[in-house]
Amino acid sequence: MRCKGFLFDLDGTLVDSLPAVERAWSNWARRHGLAPEEVLAFIHGKQAITSLRHFMAGKSKADIAAEFTRLEHIEATETEGITALPGAIALLNHLNKAGIPWAIVTSGSMPVARARHKIAGLPAPEVFVTAERVKRGKPEPDAYLLGAQLLGLAPQECVVVEDAPAGVLSGLAAGCHVIAVNAPADTPRLNEVDLVLHSLEQITVTKQPNGDVIIQ
């Protein structure tokens, strides 16, 4: 597979934030009399505000906004257990050394994404697309289209690296190449992605003299 740049999801792709995410949302579910399992089955890969609107249907915008602010604070400050996933730091350092452009494109808000990026010790991205920068979150294509644009690349010149079904669908809808890493086996359209991997350590990247990037 050939490309010119990378668009990485953050949670579940570059960082293992699953314990922190599930802890925050399970506690939120219990406070609202909901089954944690039902909430956790919905939230992954989606913007927090999307999930809150889903589970708080019928509530006022003010109530939803207040819950978002509270949840955002919890997720941005309770970072215990968050670590970089195997191969993430080495891959990003390799891209930087080779002069290959890359971005982080996350459904998380800026405070949450910055906190997790920092605690995991990841290199700084050239572009950081968070929930505040798009009107429609994943699985819509907006976030990955913006990421490609900010890197100065066409969507088809980018490869999206994702773990969540919503993110895989977003990357495909944007017209990007897609690598699914640890994606659930029942992810819709998984048969349409370029590579299905279990770890970032399986990715080999080589930059050609013409600027093309070969991924194996």
Regions inferred by a protein language model and the residue ranges of each:
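N-terminal helical cap/lid subdomain that shapes the substrate entry/recognition surface
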Residues: M1-A98, P111-R114, L122
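Asp-based, Mg2+/Mn2+-dependent phosphohydrolase catalytic module
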Residues: M1-K4, N93-N96, S109-Q216
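Ser/Thr-glycine-rich phosphate-binding loops at phosphate-binding pockets of nucleotides
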Residues: T13, S17, T106, G167
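A generic structural signal for short
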Residues: T13-L14, T79-E80, P101-W102, E132-R133, ...
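Conserved SAM-binding loop
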Residues: L14, A41, A84, W102-V105, ...
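N-terminal start-of-chain detector that recognizes signal peptides
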Residues: R23-W25, I74-A76, I100-A103, A131-R133, ...
